[in-house]
Amino acid sequence: MSAKIEILNWIENEKHKIVLFLQEFIQAASPNPPGDTTIAAKVISKLLEKHKMPFRWVSPQKTMPNIVGSINGSKPGRHLVLNGHIDVFPVSDNYSEEGWITPPWSGEIIEDKIYGRGSTDMKCGTSASIWTYIILNKFKTKFSGKLTLTCVSDEETFGPWGSRWLIDNEPEVLGDCCLNGEPSSPFTIRYGEKGLLWLTFKVQTDGSHGAYTHLSKSATLVATNLIQELKSLEALDVEVPHELLKAQEKSATAFDQGMGVGAANIAPKVTLNIGTISGGLKNNMVPSECSFEADIRLPVGCNLDKIFNSIAEITKKFPEASMEQNMLNPPSHCNPDGDMMQILKSNVQDLRGFQPEPVVSLGGTDARLWRYKNIPAYVYGPTPTGMGSANENVPIDDYLHLVKTHALSAYDYLTN
């Protein structure tokens, strides 16, 4: 019997425990903010200890522990890193009014789906990494090289205490390739992602009585006009690298299938979202202050200097406005035809009868941090059903499929 058949048989025999672990993981609430993931990290530790797996806590911030562990094969070879995060989006105290059909930290199973905050983003994917680490330890005499598990905190806020800290301070986590289980849909594999630029704009005017509009400009109207000008960024030309353009054209249907109709259209474009806006004190006053936050997504191939120059030219037209840069994560990508991409495609074909398509992610993941170090990083995860909203859930079949795909692909990578 081949090792890959043995891996699948082991997963089939242990699937009840694999599902139960994800339920327990979801029940260990780890919203960020505030970001305390200690209870959830203990759930992971308990499972790893039960299977006698090597691991350690790396906690540069006491309430945001990271879990790192490595196993070696029978001889030197390639080094694969598994990466997932422990923290999840927060939930409102009034969750029942938001339409949740079950408490968000319940991990309850309804119609063969596991419900709860973090079920798709990304406790399903992180669980797949953990089980892959456990499973491959049983076959370490049959593979070469090294397998490293990284379960991190502080991802949801792009914070400094998770993957960013590990990559800067723990050489063990770098490796030759990274595999991540962030939600991507079974139909797509992410080899890159758009970057992000977060800006805060503040507008100040003299203000006045609401009937005396001749005495002062309205800060809210100035902000509105500025936002309209910023929309022009979406029309900027982007020179997508040729090999990526080919991959994007081939994957358009699968991209829309996994991420919603229109996803393929905006992937190669700059997009603007005004996430928050605040201004004015009273209906019959001309506002003297208004502020808003802009979320600009940057496609692979965009010229950052061109983006910043365009923003500067726009802002110059509005002397009442000032701007502050809050965050910049450049876009990232690796080879859309790389070794791990081919391995993932082949295993999904064998398991599900179709080949997922390579795509660039619309949102941000920690996989970018490995790409910034010129280490290929690929993302294959569940469909993002309810991600960040009510009734987040993952079908049990999709979860088990992910465990199988990651375990088989890790084995293939380390035996190639």
Place the predicted regions along the sequence by residue.
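Short, solvent-exposed beta-strand/turn "edge" segments of beta-rich domains on protein surfaces
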Residues: G192, N265, K282-P287, C334
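Histidine-centered divalent metal-coordination motifs
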Residues: H85-D87, H209, G388
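Generic non-transmembrane alpha-helical segments
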Residues: W10, F21-E24, A28, V43, ...
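Fold-level recognition of mixed alpha/beta catalytic cores in primary-metabolism enzymes, strongest
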Residues: I114, S119-E234, P241, I266-V270, ...
